[in-house]
Regions:
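Conserved non-catalytic scaffold segment of RNase H-like nuclease domains
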Residues: 1-109, 124-146
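Generic alpha-helical structural context detector
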Residues: 117-120, 136, 157-160
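Short, glycine/acidic-enriched loop or turn micro-motifs at the edges of active sites
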Residues: 11-13, 117, 154
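Acidic, divalent-metal-coordinating active-site segment for phosphoryl/phosphodiester hydrolysis
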Residues: 147-160
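Conserved beta-strand -> loop -> alpha-helix junction used to position metal-binding or nucleic-acid-contacting
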Residues: 106-119
Length: 163
């Protein structure tokens, strides 16, 4: 796949709509040409201890952050006409659909691909198929796992190799 947008969300709690950060990496003709990162004020606006342990974000980090519709207005022009790619599509696509629903936004039925699913098929001998493991197998060292932009970059790298 030569043209796509890799996307990753982190959530504040167990509600898929509680996106608190997003990373997007734009790939055209097989090259990374743009990226976007933003903190987001989550909805519902509370942080679960375990989620904060994963990504390190707390309510203090996002209390001045924009709400999702404002962030998405910045992302929409970047991803226009591109399929979306995530590592574990059910999670990230689920987040996107849930937050669209919460804000009563019309979901445009994005074309979505899953590097996790494909990696299990094309790299069956890996110890596991976690993002950092697959990224490393594809020649990319993920330095800041669970930072949305770092994870989106790793996903983009994987997608360029296996999709």
């Amino acid at each position: 796949m030569k043209d796509f947008a890799a996307i990753d969300f982190e959530t504040a709690n167990n509600e898929r709509s509680s996106v608190c950060s997003v990373g997007v990496v734009i790939v055209r003709n097989g090259e990374i040409v743009d990226s976007f990162y933003s903190l987001i004020q989550p909805e519902p606006n509370y942080y679960n201890y375990w989620c904060s342990q994963v990504h390190g974000l707390t309510r203090e980090d996002t209390e001045e952050a924009p709400v999702f519709p404002k962030v998405w207005k910045q992302i929409e022009p970047l991803i226009e006409g591109l399929p979306l790619v995530a590592h574990n599509k059910p999670f990230d696509e689920g987040c996107l659909k849930a937050v669209f629903r919460v804000y009563q936004m019309d979901y445009p039925d994005y074309e979505f691909y899953d590097t996790l699913c494909v990696s299990r098929r094309v790299l069956p001998n890996l110890e596991n198929h976690q993002l950092q493991t697959v990224a490393e197998a594809c020649g990319y060292k993920l330095e800041n796992h669970h930072h949305a932009l770092a994870d989106a970059e790793a996903c983009a790298w994987i997608a360029r190799e296996i999709l």
